Structures are given as structure tokens and as C-alpha cells.
Amino acid sequence: MQRRGFLKWLVSCLAVINGLILGIPFIGTLLSSAATRGKAAWSRVGAVDRLPLGVPVEVRFQSSGTEAYFHRSDLNSVWIIMHSRGDATVFSPVCTHLGCHFTWNQQHGRFECPCHASVFALDGTVLYGPAPRRLDTLPAKIEKGVLYVEYERFQVGTPEKKVI
């Protein structure tokens, strides 16, 4: 092998090694982000004995999780309906139409979205308005008298419930 050929080979090998050294951590980060995206952690919402039975209550709580290498902490809210001390329905506070936060109208016994007048029954079904689907429920569990919620975000404006 001549000197010029050897130098071309050496430079090519160094370029490949450099590409691997720089590329593998980058690809690992991308794969790690894709693998952990959308996985919510269980967040403590509060004691169930402080929640009234059969009446929707909006509760704010701190949720946290890790996405890729970043730890995040968010202030979230949910609507909770306690059916018994061991059974609850938890709704995302976001209207399924365009993402506005809805409220509970105690006088009429229904959830109402102030943005485009979507109205939902106590069980989350659409009574009228442009909302394409019922209210989104969140996974919930009760352990030792404490309610935990797996907070998720959903795509709005579509007939199917899709976690984003």
C-alpha cells in the first residue's frame, strides 16, 4: 500500500470512529425519549374522605415524571366524582372540542365548556355542542384511603381518545 492510499484509509477509519462516538449517544437519547414519552406516573391527589360523594369537585395537584433525561413537575387539575369511598371517576379538565377548560354548573347538573357551548352530562357524555366525544377519563386508583391519578393529555378535536 502506498503512502497516499494508507492516509486515505486512515482518514476514512477516523471519520467512521468519530461518527460512531458522536452518533451513538445521540441515537440513544432519541430512542430513550421515544420509549418514555407518554408514560405518566401515578400522582397523589388527596384523601378520599375529604371528597363529597356524587358531586363533581375540581382538585388541583402536583404531578411529576421523567421524560428522557429531564424531570418535570406540573400543576394539574382534574374533576373527581366519588361514587363511594372506594370508587371514583376522574375526568381530564380539558374539553374534547378545542381544549378549553370546562366547569361544573351545579344549578343545571352538568359540565359546560365556556368556549363553544359544549355541554356534558355527569357521566361525561355529550349532551349537545360541537365536542366530538365524551369527556376523557383518567386512570385512577384508591390505596389506603388516598386517590391517585395517572395524569395524561389527549388530542382534542377528534372522535377517538388518543394520548399525546
What do the PLM-derived regions correspond to, one by one?
Residues 109-117, 127-136:
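Short cysteine/histidine-rich metal-coordination sites, predominantly Zn2+-binding motifs
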Residues 8, 12, 18, 25-96, ...:
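N-terminal pre-ligand scaffold of iron-sulfur
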Residues 106-110, 122-125, 129, 143, ...:
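Beta-strand-rich cores of mature extracytoplasmic or soluble domains
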